[in-house]
Amino acid sequence: MMTYIVFILSIVFVMSFVGFATKPSPIYGGLVLIISGGIGCAIVLNFGGSFLGLMVFLIYLGGMLVVFGYTTAMATEQYPEVWVSNKAVLAAFITGLLSELLTACYILKDDEVEVVLKFNGMGDWVIYDTGDSGFFSEEAMGIAALYSYGTWLVVVTGWSLLIGVLVIMEVTRGN
């Protein structure tokens, strides 16, 4: 049952990308990205990553809501275009949805969904002793590994976000 839930969430995840690729107005693009981010968090939660799913949901979607609220206020239209207002956009949207649904039907024709990716490297991390408590959280160990082994990744990510914010502020500043 859980495999089918992840499969359905994955279908909706890809359909949201189709909706983003054929967005007629920036308002709908932001909305579809927020929906796809929430569905991605649900997929992570379904695989047991409760802390990671919650953090992505709070930080990523919270930041996106602020950014898209700001950009919507800056570039709002009185009558925004919708998917049915332009025939080419509607045709691209329907073609994308049909191709995704046909792919899903092809996968489900055998009456069984199987995991395509095998996670062979799951035991590669060194596990530290937890002491007398006996409690071990994989997510806490992953975050510890990110900050200990991936220090440069965290630094580069922080600088990239800072540069991105400065560029966006400069572009939207105007004359």
Swiss-Prot record:
GO terms, biological process: mitochondrial electron transport, NADH to ubiquinone; mitochondrial respiratory chain complex I assembly
| Membrane protein topology class | Multi-pass membrane protein
Q: Does the keyword Mitochondrion apply?
A: yes
Instruction: Name where it mostly resides.
Output: mitochondrion
The protein's annotated catalytic reaction(s) are:
a ubiquinone + NADH + 5 H(+)(in) = a ubiquinol + NAD(+) + 4 H(+)(out)
Question: Does the keyword field hold Transmembrane?
Answer: yes
UniProt keywords (A-Z) are: Electron transport, Membrane, Mitochondrion, Mitochondrion inner membrane, NAD, Respiratory chain, Translocase, Transmembrane, Transmembrane helix, Transport, Ubiquinone
Q: Where in the cell is it found?
A: Mitochondrion inner membrane
Name the Gene Ontology molecular function terms of this record. Answer: NADH dehydrogenase (ubiquinone) activity
PANTHER family listed in its UniProt record? NADH UBIQUINONE OXIDOREDUCTASE SUBUNIT ND6 (PTHR11435), NADH-UBIQUINONE OXIDOREDUCTASE CHAIN 6 (PTHR11435:SF1)
Q: What does the annotation say about its assembly with partners?
A: Core subunit of respiratory chain NADH dehydrogenase (Complex I) which is composed of 45 different subunits.
Name recorded for this polypeptide:
NADH-ubiquinone oxidoreductase chain 6
Q: What is the lineage of its organism?
A: Eukaryota, Metazoa, Chordata, Craniata, Vertebrata
